[in-house]
Amino acid sequence: MLKYIIPTIMLMPLTWLSKNNMIWVNSTAHSLLISFTSLLLMNQFGDNSLNFSLLFFSDSLSTPLLILTMWLLPLMLMASQHHLSKENLTRKKLFITMLISLQLFLIMTFTAMELILFYILFEATLVPTLIIITRWGNQTERLNAGLYFLFYTLAGSLPLLVALIYIQNTVGSLNFLMLQYWVQPVHNSWSNVFMWLACMMAFMVKMPLYGLHLWLPKAHVEAPIAGSMVLAAVLLKLGGYGMLRITLILNPMTDFMAYPFIMLSLWGMIMTSSICLRQTDLKSLIAYSSVSHMALVIVAILIQTPWSYMGATALMIAHGLTSSMLFCLANSNYERIHSRTMILARGLQTLLPLMATWWLLASLTNLALPPTINLIGELFVVMSTFSWSNITIILMGVNMVITALYSLYMLIMTQRGKYTYHINNISPSFTRENALMSLHILPLLLLTLNPKIILGPLY
C-alpha cells in the first residue's frame, strides 16, 4: 500500500522544487510511473483480499478503481497544460498539488477497511475538488456550481455519519471484513428504514440518482478540464463503490426498500438520455450522459444478483475511461474555439482529421458498440434487470436507442457539415492531445481482450 501512497506524497515536493520549464515533465513522468506500478495490484490470486494493514485492504472490487484513479493523474496533468499556460508559477504548482492530494485521498478511500475511515476520506475528496472547480473554472458561474456541489454532497452524507455511529453501537465494529460475518439481519422497522435511507442517500447523491443530480451538470460545465475528468471518472464511482460495500450490511432491508429507487433510476435513465438530445452545450451533454449511465449502475446494485454486480463494476470502469475521454475531446475543441456551443464548432473533420478519429472512437464506445467493455457491462445489467422484471426490457431498449442517438448527434454536430469561417485559423492537433486520447482508448481496447479483471469480486 505504501508503495503507492509514498510516491504520491513525494510528488508534492517534486512539483514545488521543479524549475518552471520542468514542472509538467517531472510531474507527468513521475505520476505515469506510479500508474504503471499500480498494475501490479492486478496480480491477486483468486478472490481473496490483500490485507495491507489493519486500516487498508484491497480486493477485486477496489483494485480496478484504484488503478483507474492512478491512471488518471498523468492524463489530467497532460490535459491541463494548455489551460494553465498563462497562470503564474505558484498557481501552476498549487493546481498540481490539488490534483495530487485528490489522488492521495482517493487511493485511501478505495482501500479503507474501516467504514468511518472511508467516510472521512470520502468527505476529504470534496475539498480539493471544490478548490479546483471554484478557483480554476472558466466562467463566474463556477462559484454557484461549487456551492451546489458542496451542499448537495454534504447534506447527503451527514445522515450517513449518524447511521455509521448507530451501526458502531449495535455491532461494535465498522470493519468491512467483520461486518460481512455479522449474521443478524436488518428487519423492516421504521428505524431501519431510516438507517437504510441514511446509508444509501450519501452514495445516491454522489452517483447521482435522478432527482438529486442537479449539481452534476453544473459542476461539470464549470470545472476546468482536470476537474471534469476526475469528477466523471472517479468521484462518481465513489458512490457506486460505497453502495456495493454497504449493501452487504443492510440485507435483507435492500429488497424491501429498493423498488422505488429502481423505478426512479429507470425513469431517470430515459429522462436524462432524452435531455441529452436537446443540449446545445457539449460539456453539458456529456454530463447528462454520465447521469444516465450511472442510473444503470444504481439499478444493477439494487437488484443484488451476482450478474448485476459484475455489470455494475464493468460499467463503472468503462464509463470512467469513456467519459473522461469525451471531456478531453470537448476541451480540445474549447481550447481552439473558446466556446462549448456545438453549433459553433461544426465541420471540424476537415480541419482536424486525426481528432475526428478520436471523436469517432469515443462516441462508439459511449454508445456501447460491441465488443467494448461498455457493452459487456450494459448487457450484464440488462440481463439481470430482465430476470428481475420482464417489462424493464422496454425501458432498457429505449435507453440504448436514445444513447446511440445522442452519441451520433454529438459526433455529427461537431465533425460533419461545412465548417464556419471563424475557425479557419485554429491550431492543429498536438502530439500531447493525441497521446492523451490514445492513453484513454488503449485501456478500453485492451480490457476488451480480457474483461474478467474488472468484473469485480463475484466473477
From Swiss-Prot:
Keywords: Electron transport, Formylation, Membrane, Mitochondrion, Mitochondrion inner membrane, NAD, Respiratory chain, Translocase, Transmembrane, Transmembrane helix, Transport, Ubiquinone. Belongs to the complex I subunit 4 family. GO terms for biological process: aerobic respiration; electron transport coupled proton transport; mitochondrial electron transport, NADH to ubiquinone; mitochondrial respiratory chain complex I assembly. Core subunit of respiratory chain NADH dehydrogenase (Complex I) which is composed of 45 different subunits. This is NADH-ubiquinone oxidoreductase chain 4. Core subunit of the mitochondrial membrane respiratory chain NADH dehydrogenase (Complex I) which catalyzes electron transfer from NADH through the respiratory chain, using ubiquinone as an electron acceptor. Essential for the catalytic activity and assembly of complex I. The modification N-formylmethionine is found at M1. Its EC number is 7.1.1.2. The keyword Protease does not apply. The chain crosses the membrane at residues 22-42, 60-80, 94-112, 116-138, 147-167, 196-216, 224-244, 256-276, 284-303, 308-330, 351-371, 393-413, 435-455. It comes from the Eukaryota. The keyword Hydrolase does not apply.
